């Protein structure tokens, strides 16, 4: 039964990822005053399927000098971890209701760094290695603020379980009392998922394509799937943390529709940011985190410790 549930979770995720690639190309197209994909199928709707067929039927090549085992393991690990992170997400019920769901997700996102590092190192290419080192530094740095912001939110929640967050936000979405945290969280998720304007790992002008420069066909597609699965997962996580998950004062009975609309709106914001902003320089990226975000999040964390005590508010599960 568990395997069936697992498949029922994985298949829709992969479908969502496939159509997110189409959505991205369409959004970017219209923002640049062009159509985007419109040949394959009606309005280009079959483009993701054509892309998948093309990628998985190509011959997978790898450099002679690469470490073959690690080279193959890295993309598999990346996709496996990206899919594993969905397990504790309440949609509306999680696959496994973990006591420490948030901690599990943090641990999994930290492990995803290894896949990037291995892929860059095993490729035995200087560009891939530079891209991988940048990705690791960026991901580890931004995880610091993500963890502190999560802690601040969980102080209002009273436990590490995600379903209780939905109960917490029944009357007031957490974006209202902690909007500075929400802004920093959103920017940190952009950096965590290696999206523009923080896509330094894939700086085409300097690093060709970043850590996956030597990958082709299937393994490249796996990295691609992992990246987009992480984007959707992060947006669902943001919805659960700050946007009241399923709650909507106007149409409270449209449970799943509310949730999907919020997550989709956030995803389109990711694409909007990509279309609008130029890439950060590496030192600006680090300066933003260590000099701006970290002091702010620490101060706000202390404020969130005091807030429930000041207002005599008891979290739903203590």
UniProtKB/Swiss-Prot annotation:
Enzyme class name: translocase
InterPro entries recorded: NADH_UbQ_OxRdtase_su1/FPO, NADH_UbQ_OxRdtase_su1_CS
Pfam families (UniProt xref): NADHdh
Compartments, record wording: Mitochondrion inner membrane
Record keywords: Electron transport, Membrane, Mitochondrion, Mitochondrion inner membrane, NAD, Respiratory chain, Translocase, Transmembrane, Transmembrane helix, Transport, Ubiquinone
Transmembrane segments: 2-22, 70-90, 100-120, 147-167, 171-191, 217-237, 253-273, 294-314
Keyword Signal tagged: no
Endoplasmic reticulum is among the record's keywords: no
Membrane topology (UniProt): Multi-pass membrane protein
Catalytic activity: a ubiquinone + NADH + 5 H(+)(in) = a ubiquinol + NAD(+) + 4 H(+)(out)
GO cellular component terms given for this protein: mitochondrial inner membrane
Gene Ontology terms describing biological process: aerobic respiration
Enzyme Commission no: 7.1.1.2
MF terms in GO: NADH dehydrogenase (ubiquinone) activity
PANTHER family in UniProt: NADH DEHYDROGENASE SUBUNIT 1, NADH-UBIQUINONE OXIDOREDUCTASE CHAIN 1
Functional description taken from the UniProt entry: Core subunit of the mitochondrial membrane respiratory chain NADH dehydrogenase (Complex I) that is believed to belong to the minimal assembly required for catalysis. Complex I functions in the transfer of electrons from NADH to the respiratory chain. The immediate electron acceptor for the enzyme is believed to be ubiquinone.
Family, per entry: Belongs to the complex I subunit 1 family.
Protein name: NADH-ubiquinone oxidoreductase chain 1
